[in-house]
């Protein structure tokens, strides 16, 4: 008789684990986990209550997995989010297993489901972009988040009749009207993560390596640390690296971007600096002369547009420099020692980690080319400086003048008494030309030699 009943019930449900005697006995224990179900009381707030043994529904909480699938679904942009939820079955006679209106998904490329997925799990497909969610998708996501993160006291009626676009428009204050601060941070963080992840480029190939998929939950011990995940850092999802396929696509786009020609950018500058005008050419100017012509790329060439260059044939560069300086014994060792002289002058530097690579410092070259004042000009006094008499207290001092020079000799016993004739006489004064300024306590002009 018992065999007949089991055979009849097996036709109704495909889950044989429901009829295991040990499993059925354990099912009468009180359940305290939040499970995603398709019960019609979605509009009411969730409450965590033990399920009595006489209840019509027996929920079997199982592990919930969330995985990002980066495959295109029929060419659309709705790259799915794969959520696994528990499947609930009625225990009354003739009842069918409730599919909760989730769309089942079988990954043909990956073969059978992973070992950690039991027969009580059923996958659902929702778009990767939350703005494309329907009201049903929002309900599925909310029920999954409640079960996955152990959220309590959420007014689910607040999210009723709300699609993905309306959900993404909610801010923190809106979420706080429906739940606590902790739950708000968890929901907002996960929603932000999904929106940012949906912007990543997807692989357009027909097959995707399973190892490149982004798995949110992989470790069975995830439940012990999940409260420190989304809730502790709202932006933790933004720091995740893009998938392998997206990284390859971005690197390919970077390589395809046209690079500027360094000879067009640095050519005029190299030609101008390489021309010494008069005098002998220096080694750094000779190198700029070679770099100004792309025909010399076989021995020396630019590496980018920041002044870095490389000697592809250093022996040829040394040979050409020896010809210019009439030194047939010139080699790269001697040339490299000569280049070290320019390091301290900020004309060029050695690029570490690269052989035969150097970098010009155009700012240092500009400073090195500025004219410096000669030594004789430092002792030359400007002709437009007016000097005051020596008996004034504020005497202007000039460089390299003795602090206490000898006083000017006079012939009159009364120096101040004869001052009027001394200064006012147009022809008898010591200065032949009265317009010449007086320079006391300084170098005496040559025309006063007869006076002294």
From Swiss-Prot:
GO cellular component terms, semicolon-separated: nucleus
Keywords: Activator, DNA-binding, Nucleus, Phosphoprotein, Proto-oncogene, Transcription, Transcription regulation
Record InterPro entries: Ets_dom, ETS_fam, Pointed_dom, SAM/pointed_sf, SAM_PNT-FLI-1, WH-like_DNA-bd_sf, WH_DNA-bd_sf
UniProt-listed GO biological process terms: cell differentiation; regulation of transcription by RNA polymerase II
DNA-binding region, residue intervals: 281-361
Superkingdom in the source lineage: Eukaryota
Residue span(s) of domain PNT: 112-198
SUPFAM superfamilies named among the record's database cross-references: SAM/Pointed domain, Winged helix' DNA-binding domain
Compartments (UniProt record): Nucleus
CDD domains with a match to the protein in the record: SAM_PNT-FLI-1
Keyword Aminoacyl-tRNA synthetase included in the entry's annotation: no
Feature: compositional bias, Polar residues: 202-214, 248-257
Compositional bias segments (type: Basic and acidic residues): 215-226
Single GO term (MF): sequence-specific DNA binding
Residue numbers carrying Phosphoserine: 39
UniProt-annotated stretches for the region Disordered: 202-272
Subunit and partners: Can form homodimers or heterodimers with ETV6/TEL1.
Role summary: Sequence-specific transcriptional activator. Recognizes the DNA sequence 5'-C[CA]GGAAGT-3'.
Family: Belongs to the ETS family.
Protein name in the entry: Friend leukemia integration 1 transcription factor
Organism of provenance: Bos taurus
Biological classification of the source: Eukaryota, Metazoa, Chordata, Craniata, Vertebrata
